[in-house]
Amino acid sequence: MVREKKHMEEYRRWLENSQDNDNLKAHLEKMTSEDVIREAFHKDLEFGTSGLRGVMGVGTNRMNEVVISRVTRGVVDYLYERENIIETGKRLKVLISYDGRLYSREFAQKTAEVFAQYGIIPLIFDECTAVSVLSYGIRQLDADLGIMITASHNNKKYNGYKVYDNRGCQILEEAAQAILEKIDKIAYFEYEFRDVRSEGDNITENPVEIQWLDGTIEKRYVNDVIRYFQNMNIVDGKLNLAVVYTPLNGTGKRPVISALEKIGLEKLISVDEQMIIDGKFSTCPNPNPELDQVYELGRNKLKENQCDIVVATDPDCDRAGVFTRNRRLSGNEIGILIFHFLCEMRKRQKDVLGKRRRLYKSIVSTKIVDEIAKANDIEIEKTLIGFKFMGNAMDKSPKKFLFAFEEGNGYLTNNLIRDKDGISAAVLICIVTSWWKKRGKTLEEALKEIYDEYGYFKEENAGYDLEGIKGKKIIENSMSELRENISVYAETLELDMAYDYLTKRAYGSSDNERAAMEKFRGLPESNILEFESCEGVSVIIRPSGTEPKLKIYFSARGAGLNIADAKIEKIKAKTLDVIKGLIHKA
């Protein structure tokens, strides 16, 4: 729930508390427009299962050191209560990582300083590091918690603060709510010991020092990834493949290059301009592997060097994308190729892979993998959108784990960690591409072969960027209007059934209760609406959890790809007309 604040009152309080901080004071004094002050101070930056994410700047609704200090103090209080530190005297460890964004290192160091002040040992990487290395490191170092300073693939204005539990999983709602309750009790600029300190307590009386970590954990993870694939018998010497790699000015440079070198590529070319850590993302303003434009420099290298594919990872290296000689593959298409390959390997190596029989996928990911799974005796566990759900789900049965993915270019290809990973995904993408190349096929031809065998499915996405106070209200009002008139909109879209993941109700079925039970089994409540037809057409609408955006997902099945395409175009046109009307109305 968003708690509105009296923005001018809060602004003046920050001014009063900035007298000893010339930099903060100068930024506050530059805020002469009340609209600017309102946007920055009308509420607290929301903390949830994805932690914090927002535009960097001064204010309670912005990413800055004041906000981070307060939130970290809330995490401290949460840990003190969870671990009963005052009575047990237990000394906790927190692992902290950060990407190469502007101020990420400073935010990470501030986070470490707060933990150290309260007697919690902060272990912090001395260089920006990938998300997967954090998840792996938490498990290897027996850390009690992890913090990742990142805004993933958002543009340069953004930064974020993600919280991981002691299994290397992103926290879920219960933990997020418990932390938020602690944060809410803390006033800005007031981080004294208050309710955690007791007289004579040797934990808070003796602050600890920050411990800086070198690249050992990263190297160990890369080696373990390669060993994991070797144990699966899917890495067998030199790969007849020429690859261009780009980290999009992010953290992937060291680990991905190292991993790709270890699998023996025939040729590995890097995009020099994008190998440099650059928080301004000068070469790709929106560093998202889902966008064609981020591959422009890589495609030039591909043509110059007659390579097979371009592989890209995003700034915190938790997503991976592919551009072939012809086009960018969608996140779903990459997921299809990897999953199909793993199923083929499983057929050939029952003794090694026989027990690995579970696929994890989000509800917006392609449905063709359901057909592939059925044909290959693979269990499917569907989750809500976000690897926080998949990581927590697979942690319950890691030995059964085969693969996890979501349509937004997020893949988990090993059970060493509990979050999506661009490092191991980049490796497996190259292995899969080489496997098909040995059979005389490109990735596009491979996809056609898979569609011919399992059915013709098509997916597309759309989204509306709606920033600021006004944008947030538009998103809220649009979702409310759709929810309150869900059956009417199902009829407008000419779709038979509708599902509300927040109320867990189904509409339009001959047995709504049974339909709801099947659709929502094992899923928590979420602000998602789905519309579906009996002919295999589906529309899912939701607010993004990480961006000021309304997201729409389309999927269709047809007797051929052209028919599936036609169905997508038809439902997309109808849906976008509805959404545009709602936005205009709001």
Q: Whereabouts are the PLM-identified features?
A:
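N-terminal small/polar loop signature for handling phosphorylated ligands or for N-terminal nucleophile
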Residues: L95-Y158, E261-V322
